[in-house]
């Protein structure tokens, strides 16, 4: 066992997971978190692993969904983030959603309670000193300007950025349940769910058209120097989606499919707004897909146009912050280490992965890589056939050449998805040729079965541990 610590900068999901993994490997860790000494535009507390956007970890289906597969692999690897998420889940259909305060508290208590982890509340204003040696930067999308500038100078490259928006949260007791009803889409029950995990607010055609026009006309926050920054398609502001066409929203977050109005079962809604439980008590619900850059007064006015939310009181209104990430394919090796400075690793959203779970997964990997290096052990990266490996491959090199700039690789933030995995040979049922949805489902099952088997072999643990 070594006495020289690994330093982790940033106490978000990636940093907390990295610290946990390294400490569990027997290596001392110093975790540096700048809050509350220095706050950010999006964080509200000084807790570790605070969720500043959605409270959803998305699908928990490990057989036919890529992020559900990543959940399973992280459980196999002893993830603190997944342990805390499972312990603080709230009903959310087929998704794993968590009570954000309970989740953060669980991670904070676990980190502070680990005998090999020391938490230091301070801002690291520049790149770490060389004597720190093994260091992980996991400062996320809200990296302090001084550190961001130091990273830019070290890498010789401009940081890339995109907007990330936050959805409003509504007090449950101000929602009109004589208009709204509980139902998951297609009555699908997820972990801890009942098939009635979302609140649904129906709109007829006239109400929908008036709502879309209000979104288009509503006063937005101006961003000046950020205005030219591209959005990430997975987290578009609701008004930006409305700008893409009058029918865009009812084919996106407001789609009515798979839902039946409990009060008027014979009346088909033209569009539906869904709200998802945000805390364990069930007193708060967030508006699914309603991240926004509308000004606060406009949010209240426009969102109260939604049937059932006419008297809604908001626990939190929507907002917008900027995500910053590095050009990882050019800068990082396959162990997430900076090519120009061995021993310095990056993890989480700053690497260009998108999503809570993906960020935590890369923290998990960085923590294990750093611990192995500190202990003088050679650690092979996870197979590319696993969700872990597919994300690392994406971050460190799985990109096409840019047609606009020959010789430069195209690199954009990415959620885990089946398109990142190597092809798999489908099973061939005797006397039957798979087609359409059946073929797609079989392909997903084949990819996930291969991934879990390969991940189990790589970790040296039985596959069944993923469900524990």
Curated annotation (Swiss-Prot):
It holds the Pfam family GIDA. GO terms for biological process: tRNA methylation; tRNA wobble uridine modification. Its EC number is 2.1.1.74. HAMAP family: TrmFO. It is found in: Cytoplasm. The keyword Methyltransferase applies. This is Methylenetetrahydrofolate--tRNA-(uracil-5-)-methyltransferase TrmFO. It catalyses: uridine(54) in tRNA + (6R)-5,10-methylene-5,6,7,8-tetrahydrofolate + NADH + H(+) = 5-methyluridine(54) in tRNA + (6S)-5,6,7,8-tetrahydrofolate + NAD(+); uridine(54) in tRNA + (6R)-5,10-methylene-5,6,7,8-tetrahydrofolate + NADPH + H(+) = 5-methyluridine(54) in tRNA + (6S)-5,6,7,8-tetrahydrofolate + NADP(+). FAD binds at residues 10-15. Belongs to the MnmG family. TrmFO subfamily. Catalyzes the folate-dependent formation of 5-methyl-uridine at position 54 (M-5-U54) in all tRNAs. Its cofactor is FAD. Keywords: Cytoplasm, FAD, Flavoprotein, Methyltransferase, NAD, NADP, Transferase, tRNA processing. GO terms for cellular component: cytosol. It comes from Chelativorans sp. (strain BNC1). The gene is trmFO. InterPro entries: FAD/NAD-bd_sf (IPR036188), MnmG-rel (IPR002218), MnmG-rel_CS (IPR020595), MnmG_N (IPR040131), TrmFO (IPR004417). GO terms for molecular function: flavin adenine dinucleotide binding; tRNA (uracil(54)-C5)-methyltransferase activity, 5,10-methylenetetrahydrofolate-dependent.
